[in-house]
From Swiss-Prot:
It is an enzyme of class 6 (ligase). Belongs to the class-I aminoacyl-tRNA synthetase family. MetG type 1 subfamily. A motif ('KMSKS' region) lies at residues 334-338. Its cofactor is Zn(2+). This is Methionine--tRNA ligase. SUPFAM superfamilies: Anticodon-binding domain of a subclass of class I aminoacyl-tRNA synthetases, Methionyl-tRNA synthetase (MetRS), Zn-domain, Nucleic acid-binding proteins, Nucleotidylyl transferase. Its EC number is 6.1.1.10. It comes from Marinobacter nauticus (strain ATCC 700491 / DSM 11845 / VT8) (Marinobacter aquaeolei). GO terms for molecular function: ATP binding; metal ion binding; methionine-tRNA ligase activity; tRNA binding. Residues 577-678 form the tRNA-binding domain. It is found in: Cytoplasm. The gene is metG. Is required not only for elongation of protein synthesis but also for the initiation of all mRNA translation through initiator tRNA(fMet) aminoacylation.
Amino acid sequence: MTQASKQQRDILVTSALPYANGPIHLGHLLEYIQTDIWVRFQNMRGHNCYYVCADDAHGTAIMLRAEREGITPEQLIDRIRQEHQEDFAGFHIRFDNYYSTHSEENQYFSEYIYRQLKDNDHIATRKITQFFDPEKEMFLADRFIKGTCPKCKTEDQYGDNCEACGATYTPAELINPRSAVSGATPVEKESEHYFFKLPEFHDFLSKWTRSGALQPQVANKLAEWLDAGLQEWDISRDAPYFGFEIPDAPGKYFYVWLDAPIGYLASFKNLCNREGIDFEHFWKKDSSAEVYHFIGKDIINFHALFWPSMLHDAGFRTPTAVWAHGFVTVNGKKMSKSRGTFIMARTYLDHLDPEYLRYYFAAKLTGGVDDMDLNLDDFAARVNSDLVGKVVNIASRSAGFITKRFDGKLGKVTEQDKLKEFIDAGEQIAEFYEAREFGRAMRRIMELADIANQYVNDEQPWVIAKQEGQDDKLQAICTNALNMFRLLMTYLAPVLPKTADAAQSFLNSRLDWNNRAALLENHGIDKFKPLMNRVDMAQIEKMLDASKEEMPAAVGQPSAAPTADLEPVAEEIEFPDFAKVDLRVAKIVKAEHVEGADKLLRLTLDIGHGERNVFAGIKSAYKPEDLEGRMTVMVANLKPRKMKFGMSEGMVLAAGPGGKEIFILSPDSGATPGMRVM
């Protein structure tokens, strides 16, 4: 093992529990892919890392859906759990245990924690008034009440907020309220509820939220909530309800959000019982193990306020860290069924390779909570350029010569210094993975891939192969290149597990991060088979078509404005005028904001024989981190221009009307910095 991984760590990792009431979609998958990559990395480094999850299987919504389908809630959640597991497996998400909150273990821990809170005098009871459906004989949550918005008078709005004007209100303020379950007019009715005395944990939470367990942005947000004052948390619901009944409280059930995070304990306990793992070692108060929760930023309050308080009061350890991520947009907009961008996991798998999405998400993920845009044009371009055009290309250009000319046997490594750079880069890449800065890791890996491709381009094995007496040189070139490829695939293995497995088989060698310095020499390999195909935009279009739901035109609504006319073609020029323009392929080495500039980004461009500094008016459409490592096209012989912010030494090519609709041009895969655009 390397120095960085000598100390074996015991790590438990969870993702938020998907609700057992519907399918997995691409917005969900960001989190599970992010978590799976991190867990696979930890295991590659030799750590003892477990990944558990479960379906969140309780609540009114599940009870009502099962009723509509004429089945029991148990039958519904069993079916949905099977569907979820199949979807996750399709994306190579590898859980050590995938369980359900509707389990004996979860009931035990829910009751145990509740009794501890009660014994510590942190449970209160009091009567509250709620809307009640007289036909279904059930209390109604805000989302099960509809009526007319009291502010804008839009009909058919939910009981807590208006989707038309954004107003928030109480169900009692709705005009003409009705039950969304039966259609009956609800009545107000009193009921005794159980509350967790969260305000009594203010001092504990003030310290814990600043202990390093949260990202700075999250800790700052929670500080605002703590300053505003915490409220007691209603942890009970009235029958009928699908869930666990509260001990000694007939007809009262634990609210789904009480037993959902407890599902982490239950799923891990189930794994421990099956595999003989010491549960207490991970969850006792003074545990030396590490526990990490990956979640979406919309459920921070449950995981960073309620959950640590419950654990602390019940005698368990608190999480080492809770890491939140942002939401997914598609093509710059909220996922939409009418546009076909509300894409289900199964629909994606029917059309595209899951490792495309794993790589694209990894290439854009940071350790922060910013939202992520899945731009489908960029998705295709990046996968084709990075994975097919760079990484796989190295093996496909080298392996054939080894198989045909040298009976599948590698020779001696002759580029030790170059390979040392690849080996040494593993520690920096490991640091990026550890910090969940996957985008930075991918950019560093692609920098190495560029070096490997440039090496093959410079050495030209296809030319050497035709020369007499150059067999040793040809074998050495291909041996060097395939060792570079092996190191790249080692670093990409957490992101591309299936491709990594195929690479291991082809190379007859395990991809071992900690022993990566052991190079392949005089070693037999198998015949190379294509590892990955290019993304075809036609496949993406078919996926979007399959995801679309026809939306009827709203009565009385004006039709959308017609698309603006395209800008007319400019007047003709003579060819000699055009020939004066020197267009070159350029790699964006660095991209950064320009202080004081609203529209500009500063780009450092590698054009093969030096770097150029260019100011580009593309800030409205691109984040700097999304540009670094990409290939583009620039006007290389444009006279440098002095600007307020510095000297601009060229111009990158982009299309679009402006604003968010600016699209920088990218060359096809295989193009390298400095190539002239013909």
